[in-house]
């Protein structure tokens, strides 16, 4: 039986982009998750000290921080000024993670319009990010972000060839977008879990077809096509004992949060473990 305390809710599921993070306190009292994965958004750079103070004083359990997404996009471009910006911002993300006692930091190593079209830049950008993360006592996790040119599993393999100690977060939706969810169960990729290189899972459903950009949103488990019974049977079988984060958008455009839907997700995951 897995130890408890492993089910997290992404704050990105709760707040509009750059939304009022103070809403997390009242929401946390209604949500039956074990903790949160804090999603860093661009507007928060303007109020880092206030954000840090709020998160520290709130007492929210936040073992994972998800980096703001422009970092990967800047690294993809390969331009010096944008690299400098990426590292500076990444350090701010690490600083906030360390100050609230987080242990892991998730990064989109490639992102945005550039995506993985210059993947040599993303490979080259990784070590500096990892050095910064280590300085802050954080485990850096590279996510299997959707790609416009190749596919995330190919990039995981390339990263692993260059940096055999690289760690990953595996997002079920991102994998399904590329038709790669079943690769997780194949012997060719068992190094990912045998060597404990997957340190974290994002559990989101996906309703689209292969590389179906119009259907990229993260759906609640059961609202898409992913076989989650097989997924949870597998993670139990391999003895995975770390975090799962629910990211399915739970707010409507007006910012009203569907607490019941999220609590249903947490209950489903708990019952599956």
Residue locations for each model-derived region?
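N-terminal pre-domain/capping segments
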Residues: 1-92, 98, 134, 167, ...
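Histidine-acidic metal/acid-base catalytic patches
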Residues: 2-8, 17-29, 101-103, 120, ...
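Active-site beta-loop-alpha junctions enriched in small/polar residues
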Residues: 12-14, 39-43, 67-70, 110-112, ...
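Residues that cap or flank secondary-structure elements
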Residues: 15-16, 42-43, 85, 121, ...
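Residue-level detector of anion-binding/catalytic polar loops
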Residues: 34, 61, 103, 139, ...
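Metal-dependent catalytic neighborhoods of phosphoester/phosphodiester hydrolases
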Residues: 46-51, 116-119, 255
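Catalytic-core regions built around general acid/base machinery
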Residues: 50-59, 125-135, 188-192, 230-234
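Active-site acidic/histidine proton-transfer and metal-coordination neighborhood
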Residues: 76-168
